[in-house]
Amino acid sequence: MKEPWQEEIFFEVWVMVLLIFCYFCTSVNSNPKIENLPNRYISKTTIIMRTDLSSQIKLDRIPRRYYNPDNEIELTALRREEKLFTRIFETISDGGDFIASEMARYINRYTEQKGRCVLALGAGISTHRAYASLIKLYNEGRVDFSNVIIYIIDEFFPLLPDGPSVLKRLREILLDHINIKPENVRTINPEITKETMYEYCQAYEQAIADDGGIDLAVFEIGPHGTVAFNEAGSPESSYCRLVLLGNEIRHIISKNYNCDEVPTTAITLGVANLRSAKRILTMAWGENSAEIVRKVVEGDANPSVPASLLQGHPHVKLVIDLGAAEDLTRISQPWKVTSCEWNDKLIRRAIVWLCNMTGKPILKLTDKDYNDWGLGELLALYGSAYNVNIKVFNELQHTITGWPGGKPNADDTYRPERANPYPKRVVVFSPHPDDDVISMGGTLKRLVDQHHDVHVAYETSGNIAVGDEDMIRYFLMMDKIAPMFGFNNDGYNKLSTEVQEFIKTKSAGDMDNSDIREIKTMIRQAEATIACNYIGVKPGNIHFLRLPFYETGTIKKGDLSQRDVDIIIKLLQDVKPQQIFVAGDLADPHGTHKVCTDAVLAALYELRDEEWMKDCRIWMYRGAWAEWEIDHIEMAVPISPEELRFKRNSILKHQSQMENAPFLGDDDRLFWQRAEDRNRATAQLYEGLGLASYEAIEAFVEYKPIK
């Protein structure tokens, strides 16, 4: 006799097999076609699509004087913790313009002084904005490249026919648009061999010396503080050499260069070569760079963070935007280096920090604690520690709710979500077919149990994240049961043979054909359907949007287009939700979460004048790659031990995304482990501050649509 859990597993596998089989029998395509959408759903051409609204999300207002003070005295005080000269700009665009103007200034200066200027250039994705601005300056006649010599700071080896090339990329983004002489572009000779590598690298260094050395080096700070292809462990004395590329950087290269095959080795100038430049301009953008920027700027010089070895160079400038600067002391903890412009969020952050420093809960903090740790300004503003403590404690207390859709017939004055209307129409947008349960599985279950009309919209197919073994498993099972149920016809047998033969002969980096991508899509859809059924979401409320930008079959995705946005507009117009949940994981290393969020926000922008939008609240969740900082949390949904186990089970319904999932990132934990650890950590943080003790908490931040 089977145990209950065995029956459940059998049922799940059977449902998955039937869904996949039925798909190929009926040739049903669940991807909405834009040409078939009613006219009322298609955006008018007079509306300009806003495709990057997520970059305008400002969780906090940073006073300008923290990053761009009026005088050098204040700047010196702000930079007290910084060991590398850093310029912070509000936007990436502003930072790129500054780098371009600096490059033009130095090129003009050196060509005037000695007749030429020697540049060492990288072509990392962060440099593109600066080079675009530099081209604009060239077109305006403000810089001349006729006497400029350019050395490429790194190149792949060997150069594959269809593989990535730094020189090719640099031509696309800069060299083909300026008056640089072809003979003045120095790069790696593709005909060299490993046997002649050492001599060639020495000759490359000698050529730089013969040209008078590097006047200006321009490059990005990469993951974990890499510079050029100098990864963790590269010493300050490292020179031009052949290096082995790690798996993570190869994955990033594959994505940035839109290629599946990346060499395992490359030639790079060493840290010593880059430090020999008379001047250095380096850059990093976005909040996913914030942690490494803090290590580079405020940490000790350490070969484990190669960019930190630039400390001590007399003429180095690191240029970053506010996103990349958010972990620097002058931005995240300004009370340590200057007088503050206090607001509710900064006060909350300061008090949470003070609790961590003293080991006390909020309500036990004293005037002495505030004075001892440099927060005396708050005592002057509020009169006593007691007043500040009560203010922050109440704010945090009011974020906690067991009713994420609002508690009916209750006073909602101090609740994060309004009581009425009840029940609400709710749409949960999930970038991949598992992000909903990973990031807000407990909240999703609460919404269903509290009788809201919950819709789950899976924005992408997630098909490239299904391993070949997971797909073959279902074919092997269908091959066995096909004769039992009479669907072992010629069509099915031909498809099964072709698919299994393709997988056997598939090489690393080969793109799946369209049939296999559809099968993998069905696997993800079946898993999501089973998870939704487990939670209690109605079958008719499960939507597979399959946004076109994702369907390239490769890691590199297409650009967000109006077709993507119109699919979301149709769903929103059909449901007319009163509550929306959207991914806020803007630091997702694979980029899909950000694009999906941009698609939703673009749709909401186009629908901003709809009557139902006046009665709709939008909440952002995290959990797959990061968690909200407590000073930003506006709704905290507690999860009991039983609910946390239920959430784990709902995540485990996505079996293809367990141990052998292709894109787990650089975190060794499985997705359910990450989710539980983050949810428990949030609950422990609340408990440590003196609030109620919960097993876990899921956190949310409200998004205010741009009008």
What are these regions, as identified by a protein language model?
Residues 628-679:
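A conserved mid-domain beta-alpha-beta active-site/ligand-binding segment of alpha/beta enzyme cores
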Residues 22-25:
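Cysteine-centered motifs
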Residues 224-271:
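Class I SAM-dependent methyltransferase SAM-binding "motif I" and its flanking Rossmann-like core
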Residues 47-118, 412-413, 420:
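N-terminal glycine-/serine-/threonine-rich phosphate-binding loop
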Residues 218-220, 256-297, 317-321, 581-584:
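Glycine-rich anion-binding loop/nest that anchors nucleotide
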Residues 193-194, 357-433, 437-614, 648-653, ...:
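Active-site beta-strand->loop->alpha-helix modules in alpha/beta enzyme cores, enriched
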Residues 50-60, 73, 278-374:
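ATP/nucleoside-binding phosphotransfer catalytic cores, i.e., glycine-rich phosphate-binding loops
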Residues 69-83, 143-216:
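Ligand-binding beta-strand-loop-alpha-helix segment within the catalytic cores
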